[in-house]
Amino acid sequence: MSLIDVNSSSPSIDRLSPVLDHFRVQATLFHAGPLCGHQRFDAQPGRGFLHVLRRGEMELLYRDGAKLARTHLAEPTLLLFPRAVHHEFINPPVDGSDFTCATLDFDGGVRNPIVQSLPDVIVLPLGAIDGLQGALDLLFAESDQLRCGSRLLANRLFEVVLIQVLRWIIDHPDTAQVSPGMMRGLSDPRLAKALMAVHAAPDAEWTLERMAERAGMSRSAFAAAFKTATGSTPAAYSLDWKLNVATSLLRAGRPVKQVALELGFADAPTFSRAFRRRNGVSPREWLGARGETA
């Protein structure tokens, strides 16, 4: 069985890889060691943070609407900020707390479907995620010592840790307070089959009947469950996914006409109209704003 065999009845289908193939995340280690006193991390558009509190305790403050929410951390904890959120650490002034930290740059920024589904912050005791400790041990070993390739390897290990966290989120959407969206849809075994089919073949025409058949549900039951989980209709979701993949291909340097054909649009003008309706600009204008050409 292949990793993306969406027709299989096995519950162990890989729900993340097709998404991460199109929307990669790049982690960059920027701190390993003690943090003392009051530390501020300003919101940076399109950028998230992943912090691992290894030892010590501290107060976490983060922007929650118009106010600063406050949480006391007293055990080894992982902190995931998937989007630009101002946050602060208040540590003991001398001994501090021991941290390993990375920035996260998600392809697509705020339109990344993973980012769109997650809350502003996820706070997890390290022991909550089965199998995480092995990756953390490797991460700490590389971040604690300056050896050839250590920084590059630490960056990749942070990405491994993030994927393990995303796995946990899919399996525990209520605990993670996941909003309606792709991640909550993937947490439902039946809906996941339809979503994976859409993710694996964005060029196909995904009708309600076809998606419901993949999920093994009636059209009415599927449409209702899909709307509740993702906050979108099946038709709107499949088009949005197609256009998200289009931006990924455009960023990779594919010509507009080629993107249109690869994703099943009748022609480049049809693709451009759909792109403009969703993004407010044409693909060429979007590329121009990024300093690129079509």
Feature-to-residue mapping (PLM):
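A short, N-terminal "cap"/entry segment at the start of jelly-roll beta-barrel domains
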Residues: 1-29, 37-42, 120-123, 127, ...
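N-terminal intrinsically disordered/low-complexity leader segments
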Residues: 1-12, 174-182, 291-294
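N-terminal regulatory/effector-sensing and dimerization cores
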Residues: 27-121
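Aromatic/histidine-rich interaction motifs
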Residues: 111-137
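An amphipathic alpha-helical interaction segment
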Residues: 127-196
